[in-house]
From Swiss-Prot:
Keyword check for Acyltransferase: no
Protein name per UniProt: Translation initiation factor 1A
Role played: Seems to be required for maximal rate of protein biosynthesis. Enhances ribosome dissociation into subunits and stabilizes the binding of the initiator Met-tRNA(I) to 40 S ribosomal subunits.
Natural source organism: Thermococcus kodakarensis (strain ATCC BAA-918 / JCM 12380 / KOD1)
Keywords: Initiation factor, Protein biosynthesis
Length: 117
């Protein structure tokens, strides 16, 4: 019989997870969504301690739902960089667990404490 059987497909051992990280050279930051404002806007608490009003670009808005408590990557705007930004990426629960294990974010940051880099 040609082809692989269903049982041959699962991988044994360590699972490889590819997680995009914020590009610090572009000024990107980790953030946690605090409030959904409607019309594609969210209040996001960023790792530098500031709360920014962030926009969800159309390509992300159509592809995935964003909820309060989600961990995201924020790209601050060149103008009003302390107040506004764009959401670039949303992490899944598995990816957030990986970030916690690797020390990229802390539980304090997720629960509302300040994280300053």
């Amino acid at each position: 019989m040609a082809g692989k059987k269903k049982n041959d497909r699962h991988v044994e051992g360590d699972e490889v997870i590819r997680v995009p990280l914020p590009d610090r050279s572009k000024g990107q930051l980790f953030g946690v969504i605090e409030q959904a404002l409607g019309a594609g806007w969210m209040d996001v608490r960023c790792e530098d301690g500031k709360v920014r009003r962030c926009r969800i670009p159309g390509k992300l808005k159509r592809r995935m739902w964003m909820r309060v408590g989600d961990v995201v990557i924020v790209q601050p705007w060149p103008v009003q960089s302390d107040e506004r930004g764009d959401i670039v990426y949303r992490y899944t629960r598995t990816q957030v667990d990986w970030l916690l294990r690797k020390g990229k974010i802390t539980q304090d940051f997720l629960s509302g404490g300040e994280l300053l880099f």
